[in-house]
Amino acid sequence: MKNNNNELIDYMINDFKSGIKHGVLVANLTYELAQMCGLSKDEAYELKIAAMVHDVGKLKLSEYLYGRTDEALPEDEKQYMSMHSKISYDLLKKYDYNIMDVVLSHHECFDGSGYPNGLVGEQIPLGARILKVADEFAALISDRPYRKAFDIDTAVTIMIDEIKNMDIRVFLLFQRLIHEDSTIELINNSRLDIDDLDISDILKISQD
């Protein structure tokens, strides 16, 4: 039993570290993309906060998902996993941030096939549409338990195949963003091993 508990603790620690790396990358991409979409720096910074914490609900599910991957989950358990955006919203709403609807809606799809509310098109807050693009790209270029990270061009091709899920205007601006030298450097920094970073390194990577 002790060994099982230690394995679970190690899994949750690694899951937490992975979440930090993902959150930092998504936050930086969201901040830059938001300004390209015409938002002010203050509005973009609020979205950056949303992006940093958007998956906090997954921490509540870590023990349940121990040893599994999204690919391996049966359909009923994938539906359980899809609750994480609502859990994130519920955990954060007491802080009265302006970006709670963005956290709640970051898995909504432009064609109405997303969750938790099946919003369509511009019913989805602009911030959530921006965060969705950044979040999906960051996931594709990161290692997962069931696959290696895709390179940037392959990730973009996969996203084009799924364009019905996204606001195409946001996605076209994102395509411009990811070919800028500063964005490529940001992506490369995000791939550093978090064990080699201290908190000042993480803050440096995530600064404006």
Regions found by a protein language model. Give the residues of each.
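Histidine- and acidic-residue-rich, metal-dependent catalytic cores
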Residues: 2-208
